[in-house]
Amino acid sequence: MEQERRLVPRVPFVASAELLEVDTGTRMNAQVSELSLHGCYVDTLNPLPKGTSVYVKIFTEEYFFETPGIVVYCHAHLGMGLAFHDVKPHFVGVLQNWLMASTAKKSSGD
């Protein structure tokens, strides 16, 4: 059901993530499993509640991305969907490069 509300589809993408819960300052390490220009899905056994404001950092071996976001849905003991907001132009380029690479991998069958 969430996918129907997305502006653009998410693609499979694996990377490390660090989330900072804005209100409490609590940090959590997790793994991203899907990515789009507007958000991502984060695998974690302890997802944050819907509506929680976060600051998310996503890391690959070569690049990183960071932006504020909000939890738009959560699946108990599985993970949560994040929507990005106020993404800086430099980081839009990072997202676009990651998405192009992930789409190319998917097309080539890797």
Language-model features: locations:
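Conserved hydrophobic positions within beta-strands
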Residues: 32, 69-71
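Short, solvent-exposed secondary-structure boundary/capping segments
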Residues: 41-44, 77-86
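Short, surface-exposed secondary-structure edge patches
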Residues: 8, 43-47
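N-terminal helix initiation/capping motif
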Residues: 1-35, 96-110
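Short conserved beta-strand and strand-loop elements enriched in small hydrophobics
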Residues: 15-21, 51-64
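Short, conserved beta-turn/loop elements at beta-strand boundaries and strand-helix junctions
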Residues: 22-24, 37, 74-79
